[in-house]
Structure formats: C-alpha cells, structure tokens
Regions:
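Hydrophobic alpha-helical membrane-insertion signals
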Residues: 2-12
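Active-site-adjacent substrate/metal-binding segments within catalytic domains
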Residues: 10-88
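Residue-level signal for the start and early helices of compact helical domains
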Residues: 3, 16, 31, 36-39, ...
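Substrate-binding cleft and catalytic face of glycoside hydrolase catalytic domains
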Residues: 52-139
C-alpha cells in the first residue's frame, strides 16, 4: 500500500506544520471544481494507528508513505518542527509493531510554499535544501 502525505494526512495547519504548495493551491477558490482541499483529507495525522492496522488487515507486508517536507521544516529549511519528527516516528513505530515494513518516500510533490516563493525547483539552492531535509530524515 502506498500513500502521499498531502493526500491523506490532513492537519494542514496543526502542530507547527508549514504551508505546502498544495495547501496554497487548494485554498484558492475555483482551482478545484468543487473547492475541496486536503485540509482534513482522510485525517491520517490523527488516525494513523487505526489506518496502519487496516493496512495490515489487508495482509500487506509493506506500507509506503511520504513525508511532508513542510511538516518537518515549516519554512523548508532552518528550524526543525519536533512535532513533525515525532509524528513520523510514531508512524514508523506503529508500522513495525504491526509487522509492516515502513518504506519512506522523502518527497512526493508537496514542496514547502516558502521554498516555492524563493523559486522552488528552479533555484539552484534547492539541492542544498533537499539534501539538508533528507539528512534530517536519515537521523
């Protein structure tokens, strides 16, 4: 089973999470026909334990999930949001407790808006920003 942070987590403005490009896009009226957004999504942020149990009940061995860059680094760089780190530790620990191998995807197209405002993927500094982010995840 594979998921993506923006599509399932919800909690778009909770516990210190910064704004991602998808948060910005989906908040603007008429960008999405029925004006829906991922503010709540399926609320994985609050229901991860029961959702992971559901994955296990499907006889899966692996759970692939992406990390919200802006949940770890609200501005895309600089200050680390410990609540974000703690959340993903709980997700990983729950996977392991359920006998699922956690497969972490570092980035699934939800760039922090603050980095997009600095040019995003067109800014050569993105290489350093991404490397710093991945280094945090590896710790």
């Amino acid at each position: 089973v594979a998921t993506a942070a923006y599509q399932i987590e919800g909690a778009w403005n909770e516990d210190g999470k910064g704004v991602s490009i998808w948060d910005t896009f989906s908040q603007k009226k008429k960008n999405i026909k029925d004006n829906t957004n991922g503010n709540e999504a399926c609320d994985f942020y609050h229901k991860y334990a029961e959702d992971i149990k559901m994955v296990k009940s499907l006889n899966m061995d692996v759970f692939r999930f992406s990390v919200s860059w802006s949940r770890i680094l609200p501005e895309g760089k600089g200050k680390i949001n410990q609540s974000g780190i703690d959340f993903y530790h709980k997700v990983i620990d729950t996977c392991l407790a359920e006998g699922l191998e956690p497969w972490l995807t570092c980035y699934h197209w939800d760039l922090p808006q603050a980095l997009e405002d600095e040019g995003g993927w067109m800014n050569r500094e993105i290489i350093k920003w991404f490397a710093d982010f991945v280094e945090i995840l590896a710790k």
